[in-house]
Amino acid sequence: MYQELIRNELTEAAGVLQAFLADEQNLKNIEAAAKLLADSFKQEGKVLSCGNGGSHCDAMHFAEELTGRYRENRPGYAGIAISDPSHLSCVSNDFGYDYVFSRYVEAVGRRGDVLLGISTSGNSGNILKAIEAAHAKGMKVIALTGKDGGKMAGLADVEIRVPHFGYADRIQEVHIKVIHILIQLVEKEMAK
């Protein structure tokens, strides 16, 4: 009854991934981002990750697989998703939602750390403020974006952009694949 819909959804998802894969710059950017992360971990740095909605879940997924594991057993890496409910509700109430991530970066971020900001539109105000705070702290910034990169375009040390202008879930599907590849590459770099 729904097989045609299922086929169309999977075909569209595969097409978005193929278009992303066809741009060699995306592969270079993923490699550069993994190197930034590994360099930070080698210097006892950490990565702070943030996003909204499904991208928030991706930020938590990323941190979990750094501190826990991905495919193989290995030492944990310092990954923190900015997701503490008491922090988020306090800052939202007292300062406004645009500051929920930047206040955390200001408090916890240090020179040599990395911020991973995830926004399918590239226009999330709270991610933009987190990027600004990270730069002020001397942190490196990796951005996972979509569409044309939005306001985040050009603000990160490394931007990995999924140039899809349809539904955000297609962008998120590529983002989670990129996250898994980043962790795999970090593990290889750390094993050197």
Curated annotation (Swiss-Prot):
<feature type="binding site">
    <location>
        <position position="65"/>
    </location>
    <ligand>
        <name>substrate</name>
    </ligand>
</feature>
<dbReference type="GO" id="GO:0008270">
    <property type="term" value="F:zinc ion binding"/>
</dbReference>
<keyword id="KW-0963">Cytoplasm</keyword>
<comment type="pathway">
    <text>Carbohydrate biosynthesis; D-glycero-D-manno-heptose 7-phosphate biosynthesis; D-glycero-alpha-D-manno-heptose 7-phosphate and D-glycero-beta-D-manno-heptose 7-phosphate from sedoheptulose 7-phosphate: step 1/1.</text>
</comment>
<feature type="binding site">
    <location>
        <begin position="119"/>
        <end position="121"/>
    </location>
    <ligand>
        <name>substrate</name>
    </ligand>
</feature>
<dbReference type="InterPro" id="IPR001347">
    <property type="entry name" value="SIS_dom"/>
</dbReference>
<keyword id="KW-0862">Zinc</keyword>
<feature type="binding site">
    <location>
        <position position="172"/>
    </location>
    <ligand>
        <name>substrate</name>
    </ligand>
</feature>
<keyword id="KW-0413">Isomerase</keyword>
<feature type="binding site">
    <location>
        <begin position="93"/>
        <end position="94"/>
    </location>
    <ligand>
        <name>substrate</name>
    </ligand>
</feature>
<comment type="subunit">
    <text>Homotetramer.</text>
</comment>
<feature type="binding site">
    <location>
        <position position="124"/>
    </location>
    <ligand>
        <name>substrate</name>
    </ligand>
</feature>
<feature type="binding site">
    <location>
        <position position="65"/>
    </location>
    <ligand>
        <name>Zn(2+)</name>
    </ligand>
</feature>
<dbReference type="GO" id="GO:0005975">
    <property type="term" value="P:carbohydrate metabolic process"/>
</dbReference>
<dbReference type="InterPro" id="IPR046348">
    <property type="entry name" value="SIS_dom_sf"/>
</dbReference>
<protein>
    <recommendedName>
        <fullName>Phosphoheptose isomerase</fullName>
        <ecNumber>5.3.1.28</ecNumber>
    </recommendedName>
</protein>
<dbReference type="GO" id="GO:0005737">
    <property type="term" value="C:cytoplasm"/>
</dbReference>
<dbReference type="Pfam" id="PF13580">
    <property type="entry name" value="SIS_2"/>
</dbReference>
<keyword id="KW-0479">Metal-binding</keyword>
<feature type="binding site">
    <location>
        <position position="61"/>
    </location>
    <ligand>
        <name>Zn(2+)</name>
    </ligand>
</feature>
<feature type="binding site">
    <location>
        <begin position="52"/>
        <end position="54"/>
    </location>
    <ligand>
        <name>substrate</name>
    </ligand>
</feature>
<dbReference type="GO" id="GO:0008968">
    <property type="term" value="F:D-sedoheptulose 7-phosphate isomerase activity"/>
</dbReference>
<dbReference type="InterPro" id="IPR004515">
    <property type="entry name" value="Phosphoheptose_Isoase"/>
</dbReference>
<dbReference type="GO" id="GO:0097367">
    <property type="term" value="F:carbohydrate derivative binding"/>
</dbReference>
<keyword id="KW-0119">Carbohydrate metabolism</keyword>
<feature type="binding site">
    <location>
        <position position="180"/>
    </location>
    <ligand>
        <name>Zn(2+)</name>
    </ligand>
</feature>
<feature type="binding site">
    <location>
        <position position="172"/>
    </location>
    <ligand>
        <name>Zn(2+)</name>
    </ligand>
</feature>
<dbReference type="GO" id="GO:2001061">
    <property type="term" value="P:D-glycero-D-manno-heptose 7-phosphate biosynthetic process"/>
</dbReference>
<dbReference type="InterPro" id="IPR050099">
    <property type="entry name" value="SIS_GmhA/DiaA_subfam"/>
</dbReference>
<comment type="similarity">
    <text>Belongs to the SIS family. GmhA subfamily.</text>
</comment>
<dbReference type="InterPro" id="IPR035461">
    <property type="entry name" value="GmhA/DiaA"/>
</dbReference>
<comment type="function">
    <text>Catalyzes the isomerization of sedoheptulose 7-phosphate in D-glycero-D-manno-heptose 7-phosphate.</text>
</comment>
<feature type="domain" description="SIS">
    <location>
        <begin position="37"/>
        <end position="192"/>
    </location>
</feature>
